[in-house]
């Protein structure tokens, strides 16, 4: 049995979120949550909430035991980008791209 949780439009770039996703992929849920709790990255806090949601979905919907669950799949896709303008000297302007991403975490009991 495989259960998923998804967060759409997380306000962090996909590149930064993938660094954290690579750390927890394939690990047991308890170990992954512990790793995320002590990470200093912004993406770790976001990823922890999504993982906890996936675990809660597995418990509530499938009646799974938390000790048997492991992170089977984690992937991060690019979301919408907000384009902003930063005024510069001599009438110029630079474009600022505020990136977002979609995070999907799947947990399985095998």
From Swiss-Prot:
Keyword set, alphabetical order: Ribonucleoprotein, Ribosomal protein, RNA-binding, rRNA-binding
UniProt cross-references to Pfam families, sorted A to Z: Ribosomal_L22
NCBIfam families in the cross-refs: rplV_bact
GO molecular function, one term: rRNA binding
The protein's name: Large ribosomal subunit protein uL22
Taxonomy, superkingdom: Bacteria
UniProt key word RNA-binding: yes
Protein's organism: Pseudomonas aeruginosa (strain ATCC 15692 / DSM 22644 / CIP 104116 / JCM 14847 / LMG 12228 / 1C / PRS 101 / PAO1)
Family: Belongs to the universal ribosomal protein uL22 family.
Coiled coil: none
InterPro entries per the UniProt record, alphabetical: Ribosomal_uL22, Ribosomal_uL22_bac/chlpt-type, Ribosomal_uL22_bac/org-type, Ribosomal_uL22_CS, Ribosomal_uL22_sf
């Amino acid at each position: 049995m495989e259960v998923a949780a998804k967060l759409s439009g997380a306000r962090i770039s996909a590149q930064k979120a993938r660094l954290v996703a690579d750390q927890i992929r394939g690990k047991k849920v308890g170990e992954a949550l512990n790793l995320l709790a002590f990470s200093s990255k912004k993406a770790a806090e976001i990823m922890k909430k999504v993982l906890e949601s996936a675990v809660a979905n597995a418990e509530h919907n499938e009646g799974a035991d938390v000790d048997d669950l492991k992170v089977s799949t984690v992937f991060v896709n690019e979301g919408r980008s907000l384009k902003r303008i930063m005024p510069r000297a001599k009438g110029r302007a630079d474009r600022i791209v505020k990136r977002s991403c979609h995070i999907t975490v799947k947990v399985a009991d095998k």
